[in-house]
């Protein structure tokens, strides 16, 4: 099976190196990643201008673009064989709840699904671990061995690892969840440049979430590994049915 590996943390990140190192033992891996940090870029795509791509060798490329650009090039620029599966990560920090709408990690997986390819987004609550995300990568390998046949064409699965990872190579702590409700409270710092022109710097979000059962947040807080199937179709089907019935 041919795996396309990308991320939004950039080519130098420990997470993508761990994925390639571990998954390469069992699969054909093809890596293309952004030249630099591209977090919080969702499904941004480079258009109206060219994009520089550097070939390291037949299996490794660097793109001066977004995560979605990397997937697009990997699928359609004829640099790799036919791709069977897209994996994005391992992200430095989790992507749960409504984070998935902003995440470049999830955005890359969504783009794979958009083109009919089963896709997995992987994130971790461990920040810069000494082992370089080796434990998470081993668990991704175990996950693929058990579940790859269940991920259908065009599906996206979102996997998040808690800070404490067993490292046993098993996925006994994996639970299937739904997305929770993330709450954001944005704060900007304003700096006046000249009269009438100011610079606004987002100083991070105060993040919270609703306490609900069955969500990725609940599983994560319990030290489990939440796995959430998500989809591209944003139609609110129940509401649509109601509108059609009552028209």
From Swiss-Prot:
Catalyzed chemical reaction(s): a ribonucleoside 5'-phosphate + H2O = a ribonucleoside + phosphate
Keywords from the UniProt entry: Cytoplasm, Hydrolase, Metal-binding, Nucleotide-binding
Free-text comment on the cofactor: Binds 1 divalent metal cation per subunit.
EC number, UniProt record: 3.1.3.5
GO CC, any one term: cytoplasm
Chief location bin: cytoplasm
InterPro entries reported for this sequence: SurE, SurE-like_Pase/nucleotidase, SurE-like_sf
Gene Ontology terms for molecular function: 3'-nucleotidase activity; 5'-nucleotidase activity; exopolyphosphatase activity; metal ion binding; nucleotide binding
Cofactor(s) needed by this chain: a divalent metal cation
Positions of a divalent metal cation binding: 8-9, 39, 91
Protein task: Nucleotidase that shows phosphatase activity on nucleoside 5'-monophosphates.
HAMAP family for this protein: SurE
Protein name per Swiss-Prot or TrEMBL: 5'-nucleotidase SurE
